[in-house]
């Protein structure tokens, strides 16, 4: 059966993360049978990492605040998590299903495909987002 996405519900969750006035900084999109639907959401990145278990595949849209004291900016990441115990067929479908997620999640600085929990570490993601941002005008850098 072909995978579908609940666009309205996923778009509402996506917009919640994009809203600077919202405390929600991440949302997951998970499979409910053959339909991608919004999953959990929260204000603590560590709680997001707990969703990424070895038997799960999911997509996540995450907001990070970057910059220095003079200039704070929101940067967004699209993360595809594929757990170690996910079957080969499901792994393959995840790549094609991501196109459905990208119909909703259209604005992000960097995309990640991760199956190793070490790569989910907040410092690693922040570092990659900083590299994707181009020139570094941080006053503390030399």
From Swiss-Prot:
This is Coactosin-like protein. It holds the Pfam family Cofilin_ADF. Residues 2-130 form the ADF-H domain. The keyword Nucleus applies. The modification N-acetylalanine is found at residue 2. The modification Phosphoserine is found at residues 23, 141. The modification N6-acetyllysine is found at residue 102. Binds to F-actin in a calcium-independent manner. Has no direct effect on actin depolymerization. Acts as a chaperone for ALOX5 (5LO), influencing both its stability and activity in leukotrienes synthesis.
């Amino acid at each position: 059966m072909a995978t579908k996405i609940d666009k309205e519900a996923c778009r509402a969750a996506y917009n919640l993360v994009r809203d600077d006035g919202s405390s929600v900084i991440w949302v997951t999109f998970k499979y409910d049978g053959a339909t991608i639907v919004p999953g959990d959401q929260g204000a603590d990145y560590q709680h997001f990492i707990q969703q990424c278990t070895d038997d799960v595949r999911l997509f996540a849209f995450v907001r990070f605040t970057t910059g220095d004291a003079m200039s704070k900016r929101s940067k967004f990441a699209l993360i595809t998590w594929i757990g170690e115990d996910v079957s080969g067929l499901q792994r393959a479908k995840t790549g094609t299903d991501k196109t459905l997620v990208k119909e909703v999640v259209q604005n992000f600085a960097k995309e990640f495909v991760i199956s190793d929990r070490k790569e989910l570490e907040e410092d690693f993601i922040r570092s990659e987002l900083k590299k994707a941002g181009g020139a570094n005008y941080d006053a503390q850098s030399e």
